Amino acid sequence: MIRTLVHAKIHRATVTGADLNYVGSITIDEDLLEAAGIWPFERVQVVDVNNGARLETYAIVGERGSGTIQLNGAAAHLVNVGDLVIIMAYAQVDAKPEEWEPTVVFVNEQNAITEVKALLPVGGR
């Protein structure tokens, strides 16, 4: 059976900008996109840890090493600069739970990568 599973997660990144006048999307530092395996224009879900808002948009490439996490367009209404967000991308796969290992990118307050690891199922392997 094909299921939709999270394949990539950027965990607790800090929002650095919000631009209402941009045409949409979330701008993400290229280093973070590469580490997570998220492609430019890939659909992502963004969850604001501070206010509980959840939204879907698509990723665009931000300057490498900049730490940029910027919500653009209408989504900018749902976050504040300084909020913590979790960014997730999903894939449709035909895999058993014990075979699936999404990539999780952990960052510090400046959105620099501190750790990249596979998220194991509950109970590990």
Curated annotation (Swiss-Prot):
Annotated substrate binding sites: 57, 73-75
Annotated GO biological process: alanine biosynthetic process; pantothenate biosynthetic process
The EC number(s) this enzyme carries: 4.1.1.11
Recorded GO CC terms: cytosol
GO molecular function: aspartate 1-decarboxylase activity
Cofactor note: Binds 1 pyruvoyl group covalently per subunit.
Active site: 25, 58
Known catalytic reactions: L-aspartate + H(+) = beta-alanine + CO2
A matching Pfam family: Asp_decarbox
Compartments, record wording: Cytoplasm
Key words, A-Z: Autocatalytic cleavage, Cytoplasm, Decarboxylase, Lyase, Pantothenate biosynthesis, Pyruvate, Schiff base, Zymogen
Main location: cytoplasm
Post-translational modification: Is synthesized initially as an inactive proenzyme, which is activated by self-cleavage at a specific serine bond to produce a beta-subunit with a hydroxyl group at its C-terminus and an alpha-subunit with a pyruvoyl group at its N-terminus.
Cofactors required: pyruvate
Family designation: Belongs to the PanD family.
NCBIfam families in alphabetical order: panD (TIGR00223)
Record-linked HAMAP family: PanD
Biological role stated in the UniProt entry: Catalyzes the pyruvoyl-dependent decarboxylation of aspartate to produce beta-alanine.
Assembly description: Heterooctamer of four alpha and four beta subunits.
Protein name listed in UniProt: Aspartate 1-decarboxylase
